[in-house]
Amino acid sequence: MTPAQRKFLKIVKDEHYFDKDSKILLALSGGKDSMTLFNWLYDLKEVLGIELGLAHINHGLREESKFEEIALREMATKLKVPIYVDKFTGEFTEKNARDFRYQFFEKLMIGENYNILLTAHHQGDLVETVLMRQITGRPLRSLQGIADRQPFAGGQLIRPLLKFTKEELDAQTYYEDSTNQGLDYFRNRIRNQLIPELKKENPQFSQSISDLSSEIKKALAVINQKISELEIVDEKISSKKFISQTKELQHFILQAFFAQYPEIEVSKKKFAELLHIINRPQQYFAKLNKEFYFVKTKDFFYLEKIQLERENSVEIVSENPQDESFMEVYLPLEGEIEIRKRQPGDQILINGHHKKLRKFFIDNKVPLKARENPLIFVDKKLYAIVGLACSDLSKMLKNDKIRRILWVKPSIGEEINDARKKS
């Protein structure tokens, strides 16, 4: 057993990466990193008591790719190790290729009953990732670098080589990807231009960044402990508990909150605005992006998924449905009907007075969700807030024989119907 293999075996056991009888799928590119990991796993499979399979993606970017695929298939057959191969299709970008790989791995994990996925990311990959995120202005949380383990496809994704430098990886047979030497990609420029220059200033630069990443993880663990003490119910955070924290801790709590939603990008300006909103006593309900609303009630703040029907959330019939959930709206016989969401400056004529909708909602304690109900206009004049109230313009037509009648109701739940009863 080589010194590197002994180090690997110790890390696997100390970190409890997997148990005996684990069924492991190794992402095998054919490069030095993944071939080293394969060699170590294959040599130690009896000691570890594992079952091993290989997953390879042919990205088709180089002429050599097809020959490398053939060689890997032949190696796996000779060593009696299952290998699964797929070929990337579609427009090549780093993100598209990554998404394709992990979708393939997920399908194999589930379909072939693997419980561990291993990738061969090493210390150099971690350092590159930290630098890329730092250069692009990512928050402190992202500077932890690459996690050594995380849930994946009902099992675990584990990266057991993060404590190894590139120089420690000892595979003798591997396939060099010539595209890694170019400067077309951001990561390549970091790897091939920036890091070599930084190592001239500090030969231990990579280890220093790795240590910094570890320090950040420890600091965030303390913050996460504080977060766990907050009142969190169904992914809703207590506004009162949040406001009682220091401004500095509030910043990191809100960062952690949004980290639960990796698909959401919040600008620094928007982040600061939301911090301010949470600390104000007023309620808040607004679209954060195309998929989520940010909601703050007097008790909690949280994100709510935007349902497609909210954009056109009204059911309309022209004959009495004999259903109390419908609201009767009287409209003039002539004029263009418009149904839309509220806009700044909208007013309603109610009880003989023109009142801005914002004030109407506040005065009647209308729930935030209900404030998004559609409005019914005729020739730019507001006749009804669906599910909530009719304006005087509509009420004046009740006994008029020349009129139109619509029966309408919102299609977004009981909370709005309750709001109508209160107003």
Curated annotation (Swiss-Prot):
Alphabetized CDD domains for the sequence: TilS_N
GO biological process, one term: tRNA modification
Covalent S-S links between cysteines: none
Matches recorded under InterPro entries: Lysidine-tRNA-synth_C (IPR012796), Rossmann-like_a/b/a_fold (IPR014729), TilS/TtcA_N (IPR011063), tRNA_Ile_lys_synt (IPR012094), tRNA_Ile_lys_synt_N (IPR012795)
Catalysed reaction equations from the record: cytidine(34) in tRNA(Ile2) + L-lysine + ATP = lysidine(34) in tRNA(Ile2) + AMP + diphosphate + H(+)
Xref: SUPFAM superfamilies: Adenine nucleotide alpha hydrolases-like, PheT/TilS domain
Keyword Coiled coil: no
Enzyme class at the top of the EC tree: ligase
Entry EC no(s): 6.3.4.19
GO cellular component: cytoplasm
Keyword set includes Calcium: no
Binding of ATP, residues: 29-34
UniProt subcellular location: Cytoplasm
Keywords: ATP-binding, Cytoplasm, Ligase, Nucleotide-binding, tRNA processing
Molecular function as annotated in GO: ATP binding; tRNA(Ile)-lysidine synthase activity
Record function comment: Ligates lysine onto the cytidine present at position 34 of the AUA codon-specific tRNA(Ile) that contains the anticodon CAU, in an ATP-dependent manner. Cytidine is converted to lysidine, thus changing the amino acid specificity of the tRNA from methionine to isoleucine.
Protein family: Belongs to the tRNA(Ile)-lysidine synthase family.
PANTHER family xref list: TRNA(ILE)-LYSIDINE SYNTHASE-RELATED
Domain text: The N-terminal region contains the highly conserved SGGXDS motif, predicted to be a P-loop motif involved in ATP binding.
Protein's name in the database: tRNA(Ile)-lysidine synthase
Native species: Lactococcus lactis subsp. lactis (strain IL1403) (Streptococcus lactis)
The gene coding this protein: tilS
